[in-house]
């Protein structure tokens, strides 16, 4: 069996879902499980209505909900026709009525908890999966809607819940396997899960990819397909560099580094369950299904190019901690990293010297609070509007003088930090955010003007 995950732009309207149904039909002989995201932009709209309700703006929240309701009704009606839509309409109506009730409740209580945000944020996938299942059935695909919250079990870390794989695997075997055995196509919402007590959670933004990998690993899928609106993983962001090339084959390790450092095609956590079970992951384009996309496997063919790709991660803050007397004291570095851990703030890059330690983190609203806690230990300063540029490729470890080659291509760039990853397959550095287009373009011209046809398209 295989898992096919379709992102928000792949299910953004009736025409897109119709395309998805045609793609799924081509794969029926492989016993697919289909995972769908919310309709494009709906999660943002849901978060906006939850914020409005939390701020006591009742009418604003309900107005956004009305717009979302209308969009889903129109999409379902266009897909199914009036008669079939009338069969699904009562269920959709009950779902949206429940959403409105929840929004009114938030306004009445005057409190918006992380638990409630998760309940509201995951609404899009609950509804899109029902609409997709109904559309498949009408197109002679024997589909069955499966509520992912009954299958994927997580802890109660609302906003970015952590899967409990053993319990999840057991529930998938109980719920999804019997449908596959009866030649049905299970249709599930991505991103959403629940605690073992049944409280709704989400897997973090972009978590539908993660859902697909969790389901694929739990059911020992032959492969996991991530369907997007691009032809696969590219040598860099085509918006920054129009001559970016498609990567045909890439290793799990290289893809994970790229996903972590800003390649938006893939959620960084997606690959972990797939790596553990050695399940290939394919990145494909629902608007161009004939394209072979990118294949991610444990080991990829050797490339004649040093690098596989260049990624840029914006909205980075550099935090400098200076402590002339304390830095080498026993346990001091541990104290620094505990501050970041307590704020649930992951660190990207680290650089140490005799008297200071510099780290990069994603820019967010908790930076000031982190700095205040660090100031109890040492002198602290931080600067935002930075970006990490990362070059990834397994040939890095066997190429001498790699840093010299990279930095001679961008001699006038203002570089704040340099790091070579412990994996030895990436070299990263920090620059000003507004320098990203120029730096990435020059690096791409230097390292990808000629490419290995076995690895790049």
Please provide the spans of the model-predicted regions.
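Short hydrophobic alpha-helical runs that function as membrane-insertion/retention elements
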Residues: 223-227, 281-283, 348
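Glycine-rich beta-alpha junction loops
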Residues: 39-40, 150, 230-232, 281, ...
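A conserved active-site cap/scaffold subdomain adjacent to cofactor or substrate pockets
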Residues: 251-297, 302-322
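A conserved regulatory-domain signal marking ACT and ACT-like small-molecule sensing domains
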Residues: 290-457
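Nucleotide/pyrophosphate-binding catalytic subdomain
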Residues: 1-266, 271, 430-432, 451, ...
């Amino acid at each position: 069996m295989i898992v096919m995950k379709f992102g928000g732009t792949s299910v953004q309207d009736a025409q897109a879902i119709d395309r998805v149904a045609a793609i799924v039909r081509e794969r029926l002989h492989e016993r697919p499980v289909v995972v769908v995201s919310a309709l494009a932009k709906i999660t943002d709209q849901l978060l906006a209505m939850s914020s409005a309700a939390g701020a006591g703006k009742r009418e604003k929240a309900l107005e956004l909900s009305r717009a979302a309701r209308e969009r889903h009704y129109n999409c379902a009606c266009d897909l199914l026709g009036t008669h079939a839509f009338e069969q699904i309409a009562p269920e959709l109506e009950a779902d949206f009525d429940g959403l409105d009730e929840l929004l009114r409740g938030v306004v009445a209580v005057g409190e918006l908890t992380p638990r409630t945000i998760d309940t509201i944020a995951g609404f899009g996938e609950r509804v899109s999966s029902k609409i997709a299942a109904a559309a498949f059935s009408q197109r002679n695909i024997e589909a069955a809607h499966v509520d992912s919250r009954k299958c994927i079990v997580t802890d109660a870390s609302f906003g970015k819940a952590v899967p409990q794989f053993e319990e999840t695997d057991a529930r998938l075997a109980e719920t999804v396997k019997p449908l596959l055995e009866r030649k049905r196509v299970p249709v599930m919402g991505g991103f959403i899960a629940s605690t073992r007590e049944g409280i709704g959670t989400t897997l973090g933004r972009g978590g539908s990819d993660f859902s697909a990998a969790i389901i694929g690993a739990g059911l020992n899928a032959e492969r996991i397909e991530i369907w997007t609106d691009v032809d696969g993983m590219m040598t860099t962001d085509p918006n920054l560099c129009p001559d970016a090339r498609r990567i045909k084959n890439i290793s799990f390790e290289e893809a994970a580094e790229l996903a972590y450092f800003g390649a938006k095609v893939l959620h960084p956590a997606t690959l972990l369950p797939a790596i553990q079970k050695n399940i290939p992951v394919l990145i494909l384009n629902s608007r161009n299904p004939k394209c072979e996309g990118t294949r991610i496997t444990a080991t990829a063919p050797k490339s004649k190019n040093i690098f596989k790709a260049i990624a840029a991660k914006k909205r980075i803050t550099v935090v400098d901690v200076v402590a002339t007397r304390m830095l080498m004291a026993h346990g001091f570095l541990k104290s620094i990293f505990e501050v970041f851990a307590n704020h649930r703030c992951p660190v990207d890059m680290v650089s140490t010297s005799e008297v200071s330690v510099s780290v990069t983190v994603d820019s967010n609203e908790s930076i000031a609070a982190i700095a205040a806690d660090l100031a109890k230990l040492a002198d602290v300063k931080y600067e935002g509007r930075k970006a990490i540029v990362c070059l990834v490729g397994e040939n890095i470890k066997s190429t001498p003088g790699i840093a010299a080659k990279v930095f001679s291509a961008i001699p006038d760039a203002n570089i704040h930090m340099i790091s070579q990853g412990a994996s030895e397959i990436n070299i990263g550095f920090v620059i000003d955010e507004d320098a990203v287009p120029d730096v990435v373009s020059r690096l791409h011209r230097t390292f990808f003007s000629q490419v290995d046809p076995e690895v790049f398209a």
